[in-house]
């Protein structure tokens, strides 16, 4: 089984944006040293706690600071961009760093709808298959207009998704499929089964290939790993509540996270009005727990057992690990991720 890394480039509490980028590069360097398969960088917009807004620039910076590591987009949210410009950008990257660039493609906006408008997102996600065909045409140089220097280059394409719709598309195109179970695991088993059942061999890929995104936090003991994982819980709670706080230091325990959230939601009662914060709290917790259900957290032995359980549920070829660890010491982060294999 292969192991790779997805980095959303989070900004830790007390960090500048430049320091967050430096942390991203440091992790990539260590990933290269320990033989990680690939290193992808996400695309997110209008999120002050993530620095992954200009993905192609971050990929170029990472490629420039590593020697052999394959670096890619996890992914390009194609409806946000002109396929022509994407071809030019990634063709240029492949020209500068041959055989090291990968192109993961998704259809989600990676942001809210107001920001999508600011991105000039005028296309519907239903156009996604046509946009992929257009983009691939530029690399094959089969479109009426050429996009240099991408013409004739063979950059690996991957389809990203969190639904069965993306599974059908990846299968139809005969491309590798990366499922976003690190934040949307609900349809994981169904999507992977659909992809494998409907896969059509292509000139690019003879057999189906599945990458599963997982949240991975490994420490010396289960207790230490669970404490480190409170930073992950806080991160997803911020997503649910749209708080957009920077990555927070760990709390003593998971229950402390929810006690603090409950306390933060306490409101004064005015007359007969009784604000029901408990149902809101319960809903937030349920959503966070659902989003993080595909997580490998614990000692190396515990994570190995969890990984075996995951393999019994889903037929995958590669794990792509995301680690929300506040520490910021890249060796510790990469060491923890590496224990997954």
Question: Where does each model-flagged region fall?
Answer:
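Acidic (Asp/Glu)-rich catalytic clusters
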Residues: 32, 59-68, 90, 94-101, ...
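Conserved, mostly hydrophobic/aromatic
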Residues: 3, 31, 35, 43, ...
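An alpha-helical appendage that flanks or caps ligand/catalytic pockets
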Residues: 123-146, 187-314
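Flexible, glycine-rich active-site loops centered on histidine and acidic residues
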Residues: 2-17, 79-140, 177, 185
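Active-site mouth loops of central-metabolism enzymes
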Residues: 7-22, 76-84, 151-161, 219, ...
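A conserved active-site cap/scaffold subdomain adjacent to cofactor or substrate pockets
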Residues: 165-167, 171-192, 196, 205-207
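N-terminal beta1-alpha1-beta2 module of alpha/beta enzyme domains
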Residues: 1-66
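Hydrophobic faces of well-ordered beta-strands that scaffold small-molecule active sites
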Residues: 3-7, 39-41, 71-74, 101-105, ...
């Amino acid at each position: 089984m292969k192991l790779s890394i997805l980095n959303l480039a989070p900004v830790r509490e007390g960090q500048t944006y430049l320091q967050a980028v430096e942390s991203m590069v440091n992790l990539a360097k260590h990933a290269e040293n320990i033989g990680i398969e690939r290193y992808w960088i996400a695309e997110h917009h209008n999120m002050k706690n993530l620095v992954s807004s200009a993905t192609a620039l971050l990929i170029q910076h990472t490629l420039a600071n590593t020697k052999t590591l394959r670096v890619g987009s996890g992914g390009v949210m194609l409806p946000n961009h002109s396929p022509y410009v994407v071809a030019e950008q990634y063709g240029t990257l492949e020209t500068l760093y041959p055989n090291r660039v990968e192109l993961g493609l998704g259809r989600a906006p990676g942001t809210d709808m107001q920001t999508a408008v600011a991105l000039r997102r005028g296309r519907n996600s239903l156009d996604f298959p046509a946009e992929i065909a257009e983009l691939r045409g530029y690399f094959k140089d089969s479109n009426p207009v050429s996009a240099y220097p991408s013409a004739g280059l063979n950059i690996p394409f991957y389809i990203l998704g969190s639904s069965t719709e993306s599974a059908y598309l990846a299968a139809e195109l005969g491309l590798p499929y990366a499922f976003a179970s690190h934040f949307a695991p609900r349809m994981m088993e169904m999507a992977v089964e659909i992809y494998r059942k409907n896969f059509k061999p292509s000139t690019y890929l003879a057999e189906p290939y599945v990458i599963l995104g997982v949240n991975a936090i490994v420490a010396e003991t289960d207790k230490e790993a669970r404490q480190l994982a409170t930073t992950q819980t806080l991160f997803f709670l911020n997503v649910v509540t749209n708080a957009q706080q920077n990555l927070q230091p760990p709390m003593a325990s998971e229950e402390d996270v929810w006690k603090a959230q409950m306390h933060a939601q306490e409101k004064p009662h005015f007359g007969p009005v009784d604000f029901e914060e408990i149902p809101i709290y319960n809903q937030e917790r349920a959503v966070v727990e659902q989003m993080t259900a595909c997580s490998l957290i614990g000692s190396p032995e515990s994570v190995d057992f969890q990984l075996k359980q995951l393999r019994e549920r889903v037929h995958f070829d590669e794990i792509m690990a995301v680690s929300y660890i506040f520490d910021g010491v890249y060796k510790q982060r990469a060491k923890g991720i590496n224990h997954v294999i």
